[in-house]
Design a protein with these regions (language model features):
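Alpha/beta-hydrolase active-site loop
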Residues: 154-175
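Active-site nucleophile elbow and catalytic-triad environment of alpha/beta-hydrolase enzymes
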Residues: 271-294
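Short, surface-exposed "cap/lid" segments of acyl-processing enzymes
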Residues: 96-151, 166, 170
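Alpha/beta-hydrolase-fold enzymes
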Residues: 14-37, 173, 177-178, 182-277
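N-terminal cap/lid segment of alpha/beta-hydrolase-fold proteins
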Residues: 56-100, 343
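Catalytic histidine-centered segment of alpha/beta-hydrolase-like enzymes
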Residues: 337-350
Length: 370
């Protein structure tokens, strides 16, 4: 009896493994066929290519944890530079650049996830991939992140874009001959990138890519407030925020004590983020992050790369009606991919999001040449 059960389990595992090896998905695309974005999307080969998720990452949590923490990073050591802001704050940006790269090379600016930087897998591998393809890559670290000195009370959030704009203009001044510039954001960074698509004026950004935007921030936070998700995601992210506060000399011992009690983002955002922004509470801040009202205001070609199994979001929240009214926004979705991961093939040498992002930028460059 036990032997029969074990045999059935073994056969089931074999069939499941074969199924995973052969599994592929055709990405779904949502965009206005009459809009400016259409000519870019229709030119992209990667948007029509089947996505083969990594067989052994067979659920959204494995994909996400692998993509955020376990994929590792390249051995490349980027150049670091401090950028200073008008209010006395600063951030440390990093350059991923090939030797003898011409000044005319396109620039890819990357905004990391919450509390991350070039040390996180998704940011590091995207930067390395673009660098190998002759882009000058700039990791736009936020205040307090990636080893940046904390020199102001204000830290980072997913709405204000003035720090990012300062970094972009600083790099633009250093490399005025660069013909094309792109902005890529992951998770919280994608919220900043999307907002920059509305706020940008003098930066000449040619295209924006937003990877794993939660779409509905408040609802997304509720999704990860389950016991399992709290252990898998919430605790490490909250610890990252708390570590920044611990290092800061701009918060009193009483404030720090209160912040350390928090177990969810709302607690932190009520005390820190909302107050630094001049808002009353976290709810006001989360409302500013909602994507739906922004879609028709974005004025730069912007591609959202989204996985339907993202543990921080829900495909039902995709603002399809607003996308059809926009000239500049497209959504590319996959059945699998987790949050910021999109691992593909057995070894995942290049993730699906990396492949799509480069293709998107290259198509824009080609179109602009004509």
């Amino acid at each position: 009896m036990i032997g029969t059960i074990l045999f059935i389990i073994f056969i089931s595992c074999v069939f499941f493994f074969i199924y995973r090896l052969t599994l592929k998905y055709t990405p779904k695309l949502f965009f206005n066929k009459e809009g400016e974005i259409a000519k870019i999307i229709l030119k992209m080969k990667s948007a029509k290519k089947p996505y083969h998720p990594t067989p052994w990452l067979f659920n959204k949590h494995l994909q996400t944890i692998y993509g955020l923490r376990l994929r590792g990073r390249s051995s490349y050591k980027p150049q670091r530079e401090d950028v200073f802001f008008k209010d006395g704050g600063q951030a440390t940006i990093e350059y991923f650049v090939k030797e003898n790269l011409p000044d005319e090379a396109p620039i890819a600016y990357i905004v990391h996830t919450l509390g991350g930087g070039s040390r996180e897998s998704c940011t590091n591998f995207m930067a390395t991939y673009f660098m190998k393809n002759n882009y000058r890559v700039v990791i736009c670290s936020c205040r307090g992140c990636n080893g940046s000195k904390i020199t102001s009370r204000r830290l980072f959030n997913g709405y204000q874009t003035d720090d990012l704009n300062t970094i972009i203009l600083h790099v633009k001044e250093k490399y005025p001959k660069a013909k094309n510039k792109f902005l890529i954001g992951f998770s919280l960074g994608s919220m900043v990138a999307a907002q920059y698509g509305i706020d940008c004026n003098e930066s000449d950004i040619d295209g924006i890519i937003c990877i794993s935007h939660t779409i509905e921030c408040f609802k997304g936070l509720k999704l990860i407030e389950t016991p399992l998700n709290m252990k898998l995601y919430y605790r490490p992210m909250m610890n990252s925020l708390k570590n920044i506060i611990k290092k800061s000399t701009y918060y009193s011992d009483e404030e720090k004590k209160e912040i350390m009690k928090g177990k969810i983002f709302k607690h932190y955002d009520d005390i820190v983020t909302s107050k630094n922004m001049g808002l009353n509470n976290a709810e006001e801040y989360y409302k500013l992050l909602e994507l739906r009202p922004k879609i028709t205001k974005i004025k730069v070609p912007t591609l959202f790369i989204f996985s339907e199994d993202d543990p921080f979001s829900n495909p039902e929240w995709i603002p399809k009606d607003e996308i059809q009214k926009s000239k500049f926004v497209a959504f590319l979705t996959t059945k699998e991919g987790g949050h910021t991961s999109f691992a593909q093939g057995w070894k995942n040498k290049v993730s699906f999001s990396e492949e799509v992002s480069l293709d998107y930028c290259e198509c824009i460059i080609e179109i602009k040449k004509k």
